[in-house]
From Swiss-Prot:
This is Shikimate dehydrogenase (NADP(+)). Homodimer. GO terms for molecular function: NADP binding; shikimate 3-dehydrogenase (NADP+) activity. It comes from the Bacteria. InterPro entries: Aminoacid_DH-like_N_sf, NAD(P)-bd_dom_sf, SDH_C, Shikimate_DH, Shikimate_DH-bd_N, Shikimate_DH_fam, Shikm_DH/Glu-tRNA_Rdtase. Keywords: Amino-acid biosynthesis, Aromatic amino acid biosynthesis, NADP, Oxidoreductase. It comes from Prochlorococcus marinus (strain MIT 9312). It is an enzyme of class 1 (oxidoreductase). Shikimate binds at S19, L20, S21, T66, N91, D107, Y231.
């Protein structure tokens, strides 16, 4: 029951009305019996500093940060974890003993969660897209000891920047989506990860299209694991297509839940968080 003593955790971004985080986080908080609630708060760019400073003064125990503030929030934090610095993005904060914001990023741990039980050491991978999500995916693939990463994108400038950030850590190459070499790479890939928004229910993209078009996927075969970070609709057009090819498929729901569970553990100083409760809450909602 919410009382005058109840504290809160907030999601800050713009927009936030589509977020599923309140569903899964409040299910976990209720299960754990904590006097906390989780709310979503829309926040414009020009209000970010004011909102962040104001939340220090009231009963806010932690924050999730989403688009478009994941990079802008750096200047408002007193402590930043190595992984957040590496990714140049923050998604989780809590107030430290000095009433200042300590920050981290839980996206990498979220991404690798459904892959941990698979033997992927020294395997070959393809990442589709070169935006912010691709950074977390590439770092996760490095942590899982993949041998090579090929990043395919439409945007040469963001692709070049992404490759430059990781080229000293792993064998990585960037290709534009119309490069003829992609056909062979897809045929040989052990894992393909889609970080583009193509197929997402709430985007302007047509629902039944595949990232980079049907021809791009003609060499896909059943030995490849296909992981789509999109979780709505379930399954996505890409995962429907891949399942028909006999591929193992993974959607983005487990990543969403796992990164959320890691955030909740961060806010509660290492409390064991019920993944299954959060996952079931989202499945029931969707």
């Amino acid at each position: 029951m919410i009382s005058s003593k109840t504290s809160f955790i907030a999601l800050i971004g713009n927009p936030v009305s589509h977020s599923l985080s309140p569903i899964m986080q409040n299910a976990a908080l209720q299960y754990l019996g904590l006097d906390l609630i989780y709310i979503a708060m829309p926040c414009k760019d020009e209000d970010l500093e004011l909102v962040m400073n104001s939340l220090k003064k009231i009963n806010c125990k932690g924050l999730n940060i989403t688009i478009p503030h994941k990079e802008k929030v750096f200047d408002l934090c007193s402590e930043i974890s190595p992984i957040a610095n590496k990714l140049k993005a923050i998604n989780t904060l809590k107030l430290n003993s000095a009433k200042e914001w300590s920050a981290t990023n839980t996206d990498v741990e979220g991404f690798i969660y459904p892959l941990k039980t698979l033997n992927l050491t020294k395997k070959q991978s393809i990442v589709l897209g070169s935006g912010g999500a691709a950074r977390s995916v590439i770092q996760g693939l490095i942590n899982l000891n993949f041998s090579t990463i090929s990043v395919v994108s439409r945007n040469k400038s963001s692709l070049d920047e992404l490759i430059k950030n990781f080229e000293n850590q792993i064998t990585i190459e960037g290709l534009l989506n119309n490069d003829n070499r992609t056909e062979t790479l897809i045929e040989e890939a052990d894992l393909i990860v889609n970080t583009t928004p193509v197929g997402m229910k709430t985007t302007k993209h047509e629902m039944n299209v595949l990232p980079y078009g049907d021809v791009f996927w003609r060499s896909l075969n059943s030995k490849t694991i296909v992981y789509d970070l999109i979780y709505n609709p379930a399954p996505t057009p890409l995962l429907k297509f891949s399942a028909k090819k006999g591929c193992i498929t993974i959607d983005g729901l487990k990543m969403l839940v796992a990164q959320g569970a890691k955030s909740l553990s961060f806010w509660t100083n290492g409390l064991e968080v019920p993944f299954h409760i959060m996952n079931d809450a989202l499945k029931n909602y969707l």
